[in-house]
């Protein structure tokens, strides 16, 4: 019990596999913690490729600057062949037709939310223009996106 402190709240999001199917094999990751001693435990989690495929899908259906930032950040960390293998199903499941021009048309909406959404999460937040242009070039280079 912690009588002097507010209760600890933990949010757990359980999504049905029929709504958000995992298409790529999960990976096992060691739990990193700030305490001394070896915990020696790992957890099963989404692969970076699954996360990247989800981020690419979601950027075409919602306007959250975090998705653009994450896509640009994950580019060098993911196997794009695996990402591209999952994308057609990711789009189809949600009924999304990825349209790069429509994404560019939402530029001002992304820009308006950039600082308020991210500056409290990312210490050295890069400029919106730089990240947005990099993201558009990257996505425009993918064969699946028109």
Language-model features, listed with the residues they occupy:
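Structured mid-to-C-terminal alpha-helical surface segments
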Residues: 1-146
């Amino acid at each position: 019990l912690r009588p002097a402190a507010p209760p600890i709240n933990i949010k757990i999001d359980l999504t049905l596999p029929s709504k958000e199917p995992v298409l790529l094999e999960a990976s096992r990751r060691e739990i990193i913690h700030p305490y001394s001693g070896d915990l020696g435990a790992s957890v099963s989690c989404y692969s970076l490729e699954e996360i990247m495929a989800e981020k690419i899908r979601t950027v075409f259906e919602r306007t959250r600057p975090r998705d653009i930032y994450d896509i640009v950040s994950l580019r060098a960390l993911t196997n794009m062949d695996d990402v591209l293998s999952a994308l057609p199903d990711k789009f189809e499941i949600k009924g999304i037709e990825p349209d790069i021009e429509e994404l560019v048309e939402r530029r001002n909406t992304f820009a308006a939310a950039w600082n308020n959404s991210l500056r409290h999460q990312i210490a050295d937040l890069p400029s919106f223009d730089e990240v947005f242009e990099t993201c558009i070039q990257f996505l425009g280079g993918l064969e699946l996106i028109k």
